[in-house]
Amino acid sequence: MTFTASQLLALLPLLLTTGAMVALMLAIAWKRCDDTAFVVTIAGLNLALFSLPIVMAQGDQGVTPLLQIDGYAVFYMGLVLIGALATCTFGRSWLKGYPDNREEFYLLLLIATAGGLVLAGSRHLASLFIGIEMLTLPMFGLVGYAYRERHSLEASIKYMVLSAAATAFLLFGMALLYAQAGSLSFSDLGLTLATTPAHHPLLMGGLGLMLVGFAFKLSLAPFHLWTPDVYEGAPAPVATFLATVSKIAVFCVLLRFYLAVPAAADPMIHWLLAAMAVISIVIGNLLALLQTNIKRMMGYSSISHFGYLLAVIVASRLGQMPVEAAGVYLLMYLFTSLGAFGVISMMSSPYRGKDADSLHSYRGLFWRRPYLTAVLTVMMLSLAGIPMTLGFIGKFYLIGVTVDAKLWWLSGAIVLGSALGLYYYLRVMVTLYLREPGMQLRDAKGDWAITSGGLVVLLSAALVVALGLYPQPVISLVQGFQNVVLH
């Protein structure tokens, strides 16, 4: 097998991330220094991000039978790298209070990011599985990184056991599809399964088992039970990565698979996805109403947000509009989640025990840190889909797609879920502006705004507001990147 120069250039983000990974391993072996580890990680991720225009200039490139680097892949690679960079900067602040080895945090982060990049360009079940495993396995260590805390170890073990079960379902589903089609390529599966009789046992069984695996990775109901415990137990920067990079990478490969394999649009699978979307929206929002822990609340909130996004897959038989809607919504979800979890990271440190995840810890924050409060307020408004924020544009797109597909009941579920979500997001905002209690509460550092994590949080808030007021740059960006090559 030979590689052309264009194919190698198309792999630049993955090659640069892998190079940073190797350089970091050598640096750790030579001399432990968390400053060096941070610089190597940030440099590698930035180089990978700034290489994306070079990748786009190569056009659509099929790199081996495993990867397709097209506009769709480049867009989601960008989201993965932005999320990883933000996680790295939040981790820098959090690790300053960490008493043990810090360098492995960055190494595990780079490995997981490489897995996300593989998923963004995957067009083969083998690369899909490799990408998911590269993304998932480092998360076991990252979730349990604060291993002196019992809740962190518990979260890591739960995530590991349940993730192993989900991987078994995914692999078994792939095996059944291979037995029926004789190929693992998305395009070959699409061509072969299109001629397979409807409701063939191997076809339905394979697609159903794969759907279970994907549903776990996206924490969709009824496979969501791990989510609140893992979000609560994971360090705040790791929860950021779980909520953004991990889910965005898995969703983008699921959407490509669904578009490439027409058999996945079988009415039975179609209605199963639709039911899962509605259940996720309802359960995610109802359980979030009951939470007094902000990380658990964000965990349940993420269940509902990916329930909304399942509506895109249900409507995706209509053409490119659902693909565009998914891109806009995930861009909004990325920046909004980075801002919200960034504030939690600013308030947390291992020196002070558990993360500042109790809602009570944020009572009266406005009177101590008004600008940090403004950032969290903007993020809550955006997640609720309030006008003049990027969240409103994302929700508008989703409702537009479901209305266009005449899925009125699904549109109603999105509206109902948004109304329920408004209540618990407003509860967080009200808590921020209450008068401070007499007792001393957790607080961010006085110079939080000039730290790398603080700058990321402020930039995220500025983008959420600016792009909510004038969304055309986002729409044009997404439209320019959404060419999906399915062969």
UniProtKB/Swiss-Prot annotation:
> Which terms are listed as keywords in the entry?
Cell inner membrane, Cell membrane, Membrane, NAD, Quinone, Translocase, Transmembrane, Transmembrane helix, Transport, Ubiquinone
The yes or no answer to whether the keyword NADP is present is no
Q: Where are the transmembrane segments?
A: 8-28, 37-57, 71-91, 104-124, 125-145, 159-179, 203-223, 235-255, 269-289, 303-323, 327-347, 374-394, 408-427, 449-469
Q: Which residues form a coiled coil?
A: none
Q: How does it sit in the membrane?
A: Multi-pass membrane protein
Task: Give the UniProt entry's GO cellular component terms.
Answer: plasma membrane
Q: Name one GO molecular function term.
A: quinone binding
Where it sits in the cell: the answer is: Cell inner membrane
What protein family is recorded? Answer: Belongs to the complex I subunit 2 family.
Q: What is the lineage of its organism?
A: Bacteria, Pseudomonadati, Pseudomonadota, Gammaproteobacteria, Aeromonadales
Gene Ontology biological process terms in this record: ATP synthesis coupled electron transport
Alphabetical list of InterPro entries matching this protein: NADH-Q_OxRdtase_suN/2, ND/Mrp_TM
What gene does this protein come from?
Answer: nuoN
Superkingdom classification of source: Bacteria
Q: What does this protein do?
A: NDH-1 shuttles electrons from NADH, via FMN and iron-sulfur (Fe-S) centers, to quinones in the respiratory chain. The immediate electron acceptor for the enzyme in this species is believed to be ubiquinone. Couples the redox reaction to proton translocation (for every two electrons transferred, four hydrogen ions are translocated across the cytoplasmic membrane), and thus conserves the redox energy in a proton gradient.
What's its catalytic activity? a quinone + NADH + 5 H(+)(in) = a quinol + NAD(+) + 4 H(+)(out)
Enzyme Commission code(s) on record: 7.1.1.-
Quaternary structure? NDH-1 is composed of 14 different subunits. Subunits NuoA, H, J, K, L, M, N constitute the membrane sector of the complex.
Q: Mind telling me what this protein is named?
A: NADH-quinone oxidoreductase subunit N
